[in-house]
From Swiss-Prot:
GTPase that plays an essential role in the late steps of ribosome biogenesis. Keywords: GTP-binding, Nucleotide-binding, Repeat, Ribosome biogenesis. This is GTPase Der. GTP 1 binds at residues 9-16, 56-60, 118-121. CDD domains: EngA1, EngA2. It comes from Salmonella typhimurium (strain LT2 / SGSC1412 / ATCC 700720).
Length: 490
C-alpha cells in the first residue's frame, strides 16, 4: 500500500513550500477539490524509489474556536487518513500557543508524528529548536523547505518502515543485454523470459469517480450478476475493500472505494467521497474504471482523477453511466463533449451504460481484459528496434546544432505500464513533438489499447569523455618538427 504523509501546522510555517518541493519530483498536483476536501491538496511524490501520497492542509491559526473544531474541519481528517504526520513549526517565529495546542492533540492520536522545524536557514539549528522540545514529540528535524536542506534526511526517517518494499536495482549492461537478445532472436532462438505470467494472476480492477456517479450501483450490479463472491477482505478503516470474483473463467479482485452495501443502506453520508481511498485504489489496481455521470458531463474533478490515473500509468476504461433515459439529442451532445475534452486519451475504450438497469455492464470486461493484456504484453527487443527504425524512416529526427539526433536501438524497460527505452545520441534534445510522435507510432504498431505507453530515452556514453588525449611516439616526433618549423618562421 502506498504510504500517506500529512503536513499539519499553523499558517505560514512552510507546509505548502514543502508540499511543492515533494510533489515536484513527479511534477504533478494530483487533486484540489474545493468544497469536498476542505482546502486539502493531494500530491504524489517519490523518494529513492518509494512512492507516497502527500497531503497539504490549511493552517490552524489559533485556539479561539477550539483546536478540536478547527482540526475537525481539515487537519483532523488529514491526520486520520495519513500513515505518518509531519507537524511543522516555524523556527524563526519560535514556539507559539497554537503549536502547543496542536501538539497536545497529536499526542492523543496513535499516529507516528515527526516534529519538523522549518526556516532554519541562516540560523543555528541546535539553538533554534530548543524551545520546541517542550512539545513532547521527541526528536526535532530541522529543515529549510525553500532550499531543500534537510528534506531528504527527514524523508529517509519518515519512509523507513516502507523502504523494504522497494526492490533493489541491479546494475545491468544494457548494450550487452540488447545484442545478446538481438542475436538470439535473429538466430530463431527464443529470448529468455522471466518467471512472471500475467495470466496466472487475478486482474485488480478499481472503480473510481466523483460522488453519486454510480460507483456503488455498478459494483453491486457486477457482483449481483456474478454471485461468486467468496468473502470481503476489509483492511483498516480507511482502506478500500478487496473483493475476489470470477467471470468467464478469469479471476478478478474488485477494489471498491465505497464499500459493498445493500441498496437500502446506501445513504449520502456513506457515499461520501474519499480522496485517499480513491488514490490508493488507483495505485494498487491494474485496470481502472473511471465512472462519469452522463447527465453532468466531464467536470474538473473527473479530469483531476484522470490525470492521476495517467500519471500512475494504469490501464483505463472510461464508463459513462446513467445513459438510460437521455434523449438522442442529449446523447449526441454528450458524445461531442467527450470527444472534445477527452481527445488526448484516444487509447481508452469508452462505454455507455446504465448501472441501475444493467445495460452495457457485461461488455466492460472485454475492454478490461484487453487493457490488461496490452499493459502486460511482452515484446522482444528486436521488434521494438524494428518499430523504432520504421518510425525514423517515416519521419527523421530533427537537427540539433547542425547534427541529426541518432536513435540506436530500443528495448522493453517495464510493464504495466509498458515502457520502451530508446538509446541514442543527443536524445535529451529531442523536442516533445517528436517524442509524442514516437509514442503514438509505438502504440499503433503494437496495437496497444487501454493503456498508456511511456518512452524513456538514454544517452549513449562517449568512450572518450573525460579522457586526456595521448599522442603516439610518431605523433610526438611530428609535433616537435612542426614546432621547430614554426619557431624558424618567426
Amino acid at each position: 500500500m502506498v504510504p500517506v504523509v500529512a503536513l499539519v501546522g499553523r499558517p505560514n510555517v512552510g507546509k505548502s513550500t514543502l508540499f511543492n518541493r515533494l510533489t515536484r519530483t513527479r511534477d504533478a498536483l494530483v487533486a484540489d477539490f474545493p468544497g469536498l476536501t476542505r482546502d486539502r491538496k493531494y500530491g504524489r511524490a517519490e523518494v529513492e524509489g518509494r512512492e507516497f501520497i502527500c497531503i497539504d492542509t490549511g493552517g490552524i491559526d489559533g485556539t479561539e474556536d477550539g483546536v478540536e473544531t478547527r482540526m475537525a474541519e481539515q487537519s483532523l481528517l488529514a491526520i486520520e487518513e495519513a500513515d505518518v504526520v509531519l507537524f511543522m513549526v516555524d523556527a524563526r517565529a519560535g514556539l507559539m500557543p497554537a503549536d502547543e495546542a496542536i501538539a497536545k492533540h497529536l499526542r492523543s492520536r496513535e499516529k507516528p508524528t515527526f516534529l519538523v522545524a522549518n526556516k532554519t536557514d541562516g540560523l543555528d539549528p541546535d539553538q533554534a529548536v530548543v524551545d520546541f522540545y517542550s512539545l513532547g514529540l521527541g526528536e526535532i528535524y530541522p529543515i529549510a523547505a525553500s532550499h531543500g536542506r534537510g528534506v531528504l534526511s527527514l524523508l529517509e526517517h519518515v519512509l523507513l518502515p516502507w523502504m523494504d518494499d522497494v526492490a533493489p536495482q541491479e546494475e545491468v549492461d544494457e548494450d550487452a543485454e540488447y545484442w545478446a537478445q538481438f542475436e538470439a532472436e535473429q538466430n530463431g532462438e527464443e529470448a529468455p523470459e522471466d518467471d512472471f505470467d500475467p495470466q496466472s494472476l487475478p486482474i485488480k480492477l478499481a472503480i473510481v469517480g466523483r460522488p453519486n456517479v454510480g460507483k456503488s450501483t455498478l459494483t453491486n450490479r457486477i457482483l449481483g450478476e456474478e454471485r461468486v463472491v467468496v468473502y470481503d477482505m476489509p483492511g483498516t478503516t480507511r482502506d478500500s475493500i478487496y473483493i475476489p470474483m470470477e467471470r468467464d473463467e478469469r479471476e478478478y479482485v474488485l477494489i471498491d472505494t465505497a464499500g459493498v452495501r445493500k441498496r437500502g443502506k446506501i445513504t449520502d453520508a456513506v457515499e461520501k467521497f474519499s480522496v485517499i481511498k480513491t488514490l490508493q485504489a488507483i495505485e494498487d489496481a491494474n485496470v481502472v474504471l473511471l465512472v462519469i455521470d452522463a447527465r453532468e458531463g466531464i467536470s474538473d474533478q473527473d479530469l483531476s482523477l484522470l490525470g492521476f490515473i495517467l500519471n500512475s500509468g494504469r490501464s483505463l476504461v472510461i464508463v459513462v453511466n446513467k445513459w438510460d433515459g437521455l434523449s438522442q439529442e442529449v446523447k449526441e451532445q454528450v458524445k461531442e463533449t467527450l470527444d472534445f475534452r477527452l481527445g488526448f486519451i484516444d487509447f481508452a475504450r469508452v462505454h455507455f451504460i446504465s448501472a441501475l438497469h444493467g445495460s452495457g455492464v457485461g461488455n466492460l470486461f472485454e475492454s478490461v481484459r484487453e487493457a490488461y493484456d496490452s499493459s502486460t504484453r511482452r515484446v522482444s527487443t528486436a521488434m521494438l528496434t524494428r518499430i523504432m527504425t520504421m518510425a525514423v524512416e517515416d519521419h527523421q529526427p530533427p537537427l540539433v546544432r547542425g547534427r541529426r539526433v541518432k536513435l540506436k536501438y530500443a528495448h522493453a524497460g517495464g510493464y504495466n505500464p509498458p515502457i520502451v527505452v530508446i538509446h541514442g545520441n543527443q536524445v535529451k534534445d529531442l523536442p516533445d513533438s517528436y517524442k509524442r510522435y514516437l509514442m503514438n507510432y509505438f502504440r499503433k504498431s503494437l496495437e496497444v489499447m487501454g493503456t498508456p505507453i511511456r518512452i524513456q530515452f538514454k544517452e549513449g556514453e562517449n568512450p572518450y569523455a573525460n579522457k586526456r588525449n595521448t599522442l603516439t611516439p610518431t605523433q610526438m616526433r611530428k609535433r616537435k618538427r612542426l614546432m621547430k618549423h614554426i619557431k624558424k618562421s618567426k
